[in-house]
């Protein structure tokens, strides 16, 4: 399975106080150790780095993501992301701007989204987004 890993899962994976049995973190660890393709997006890295982080934490994140395959949006992905968010909004499922772009990247590259953000699960009922389930 090819996964696009969202900010919520990376954040849990990097925290020291995350319980070891969080299903999404276990799935990420297995994917990284196995033969699954694991991707993230530049916008996800930005979300992780945003705000004040000690220099050593920034350095650790930079080192870990240096070998990661980053999905980057193309011009048409921005238009497609807006087209995804609109039907979700009409159906009462919130899909924010950045989340719409992440969803579009997953759809465009035929990836399953690994996330703990319930907004994606709700949106998946209205758009062709595959969200990982335990």
Positions of the model-derived regions?
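Short, well-structured N-terminal submotif of metal-dependent ribonuclease cores
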Residues: 1-40, 50-63
């Amino acid at each position: 399975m090819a996964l696009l890993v969202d900010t919520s899962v990376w954040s849990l994976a990097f925290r020291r106080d995350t319980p070891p049995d969080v299903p999404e973190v276990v799935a990420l660890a297995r994917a990284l150790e196995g033969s699954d393709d694991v991707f993230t997006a530049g916008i996800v890295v930005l979300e992780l780095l945003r705000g004040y982080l000690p220099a050593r934490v920034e350095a650790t994140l930079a080192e870990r993501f240096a070998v990661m395959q980053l999905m980057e949006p193309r011009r048409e992905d921005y238009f497609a992301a807006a087209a995804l968010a609109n039907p979700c909004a009409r159906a009462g499922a919130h899909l924010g701007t950045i989340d719409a772009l992440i969803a579009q990247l997953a759809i465009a590259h035929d990836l399953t989204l690994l996330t703990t953000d319930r907004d994606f699960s709700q949106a998946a009922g209205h758009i062709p987004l595959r969200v990982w389930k335990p």
